[in-house]
Amino acid sequence: QMHGGIISALLDSAMTHCLFHRNVEGVTAELTVKYLKPVPQEADLRLSAWVEQKILTLYKLKAELSVGGEVLVKAESKFMEIRKQS
C-alpha cells in the first residue's frame, strides 16, 4: 500500500498545478484528505483536481485519486493566492 503522506503530497501537487494552469501562484492554507480505500503501490493512478470556488484571493479546490475508475482518496483544500509585486 502507498504511504498516506505520499498520497497527500500528490493530491496537494495536483491542486497546485490546477492553479498554475490558471496562471495563479498560491500556497496551501488548509488541506483535508479522506482515505476511502488503500492505494496499491504498483497501480496506475489517475489524479483529478478542480477549482470549486474563488473568493478574493482564496481558492477552494477539490481533488481525487482513482485506480481503474474507482475513487480511493478525496481531498479538499484552501489556497491563498500570492500577489506578485512589481
Residue ranges and their predicted role:
Residues 1, 28-34, 46, 60, ...:
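Conserved beta-strand segments that form the floor/walls of ligand-binding pockets within enzyme
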Residues 1-18:
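Hot-dog-fold acyl-thioester-processing enzymes
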Residues 4-5, 9, 30, 42, ...:
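Surface-exposed loop/turn and secondary-structure junction residues enriched for glycine/proline
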Residues 4-5, 26, 68-69:
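Residue-identity detector for glycine
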Residues 13-46, 51:
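Hydrophobic beta-strand-centered segment that forms part of the acyl-chain substrate-binding groove
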Residues 39-41, 52-86:
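HotDog/MaoC-like acyl-thioester-processing domains
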